[in-house]
């Protein structure tokens, strides 16, 4: 069953709606991830910073809530909004490539803090424990957040926010598809067969309408705003707050296109999301090598040794790579697969991505060495 929105009889109007809404949520998701990372970076922190753990947790919880709302047909009149929040916002808020980079840096003792303080593991075998620590904490927190979000949406929001039962609902058959990995059509069909269609209370309908219209209207103003800010301010904000959001737009659409093109090829292995995550991890390894790799073995000067270039590389790492890869869709897809297929999907994705980091960033770190970036 293909689940698509009914926005307008004119396809151009619909595509503009999708483009604007998706763009807005990609910008907001990238900016939120940057803000949460900055907020969670302090000393002494229980969760060692910098990390995308908080962002991944938040995005998976929101993804779970949206899955429940959509499964009970709450989003039947707002499918473009659903696409924007799940694939756009949650996808940009979470980051698979950043998680893999954390995993690599901790397991190889190459974090910025360890290099600056000359911190060493008791022996190299402890790298295995560091690898498992990052992997298990991220995956378990993300999966737990998704399950909690789904139950919160089902048992609280849908249960207490529905005004009445609605008539049986037949989804339209054009545009936004399940292939993006964020539409659970099986659960939706099950609820339809069991006559579990619910109508959200007027407050929620109005809220969805307002958010949908705001997302539609804010796309181009936000693009113009960030372009102007990026051009005017040449300080650290260019690499941390402005450029990442602009790069995130292109990354978000690339991820969505890959999912639309390739996820339908194999229902047991979401190939589109896999390609997006692996490609983003390869790029983040290369960009990190350029930003932190020593120019010469005998000096601590990095390859990128100008402040402006360093900010641009930082924006590519957090904006393009961070948004191109996603944990929320990755976890949600695994949740919908059988347990064995989920293990295969997760293992192959993580193993290949980690090996790419070893080949790119690791080989340079162990021959020339890494240093801290200048920005």
From Swiss-Prot:
Bilayer topology term: Multi-pass membrane protein
Localization per Swiss-Prot or TrEMBL: Cell membrane
Top-rank taxon: Eukaryota
Cytoplasmic side stretches: 1-11, 56-79, 149-213, 263-268, 332-338
Pfam families, per the entry: CRCB
Keyword Nucleotide-binding assigned: no
A single GO cellular-component term on record: cell periphery
Annotated TM spans: 12-32, 35-55, 80-100, 128-148, 214-234, 242-262, 269-289, 311-331, 339-359
GO biological process, one term: fluoride transmembrane transport
Catalytic activity: fluoride(in) = fluoride(out)
Annotated InterPro entries: FluC
Phenotype of null mutants: Highly sensible to fluoride, but not to other halide salts. The growth of a double deletion of both FEX1 and FEX2 is inhibited at almost a 1000-fold lower fluoride concentration than in the wild-type. Has increased intracellular fluoride concentrations.
Glycosylation sites noted in the Swiss-Prot or TrEMBL record: 109, 117, 235
Residues on Extracellular side: 33-34, 101-127, 235-241, 290-310, 360-375
Keywords: Cell membrane, Glycoprotein, Membrane, Transmembrane, Transmembrane helix
Main location: membrane
Gene Ontology molecular function: fluoride transmembrane transporter activity
PANTHER family noted in UniProt: FLUORIDE EXPORT PROTEIN 1-RELATED
Protein family membership: Belongs to the fluoride channel Fluc/FEX (TC 1.A.43) family.
UniProt miscellaneous comment: Present with 220 molecules/cell in the plasma membrane.
Function: Fluoride channel required for the rapid expulsion of cytoplasmic fluoride.
Protein name, UniProt field: Fluoride export protein 1
Organism of derivation: Saccharomyces cerevisiae (strain ATCC 204508 / S288c) (Baker's yeast)
Phylogenetic lineage: Eukaryota, Fungi, Dikarya, Ascomycota, Saccharomycotina
Record gene name: FEX1
């Amino acid at each position: 069953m293909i689940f698509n929105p009914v926005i307008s009889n004119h396809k151009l109007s619909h595509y503009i709606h999708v483009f604007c809404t998706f763009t807005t949520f990609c910008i907001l998701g990238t900016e939120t991830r940057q803000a949460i990372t900055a907020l969670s970076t302090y000393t002494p922190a229980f969760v060692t910073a910098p990390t995308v753990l908080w962002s991944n947790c938040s995005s998976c919880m929101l993804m779970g809530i949206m899955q429940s709302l959509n499964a009970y047909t709450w989003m039947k009149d707002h499918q473009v909004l659903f696409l924007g929040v799940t694939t756009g916002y949650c996808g940009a808020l979470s980051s698979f490539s950043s998680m893999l980079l954390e995993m690599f840096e901790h397991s190889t003792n190459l974090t910025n803090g360890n290099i600056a303080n000359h911190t060493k593991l008791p022996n190299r075998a402890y790298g295995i424990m560091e690898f498992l620590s990052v992997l298990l904490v991220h995956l378990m927190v993300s999966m737990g957040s998704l399950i909690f979000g789904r139950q919160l949406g089902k048992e609280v929001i849908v249960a207490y926010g529905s005004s009445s039962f609605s008539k049986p609902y037949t989804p339209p058959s054009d545009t936004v598809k399940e292939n993006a990995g964020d539409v659970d059509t099986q659960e939706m069909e099950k609820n339809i067969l069991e006559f579990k269609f619910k109508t959200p209370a007027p407050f929620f309908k109005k809220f969805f309408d307002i958010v949908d219209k705001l997302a539609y209207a804010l796309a181009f103003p936000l693009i113009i705003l960030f372009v102007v800010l990026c051009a005017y301010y040449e300080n650290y904000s260019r690499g941390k707050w402005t450029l990442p959001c602009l790069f995130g737009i292109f990354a978000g659409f690339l991820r969505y296109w890959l999912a639309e093109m390739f996820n339908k090829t194999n229902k047991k292995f979401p190939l589109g999301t896999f390609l997006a995550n692996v490609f983003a991890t390869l790029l983040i390894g290369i960009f990190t090598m350029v930003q932190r790799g020593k120019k010469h073995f005998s000096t601590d000067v990095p390859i990128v040794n100008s402040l402006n270039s360093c900010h641009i590389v930082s924006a590519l790492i957090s904006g393009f790579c961070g948004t191109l890869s996603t944990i929320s869709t990755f976890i949600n897809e695994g949740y919908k697969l059988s347990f064995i297929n989920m293990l295969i999907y997760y293992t192959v994705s993580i193993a290949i991505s980690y090996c790419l980091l070893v080949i790119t960033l690791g080989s340079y770190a162990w021959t020339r060495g890494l240093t801290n970036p200048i920005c």
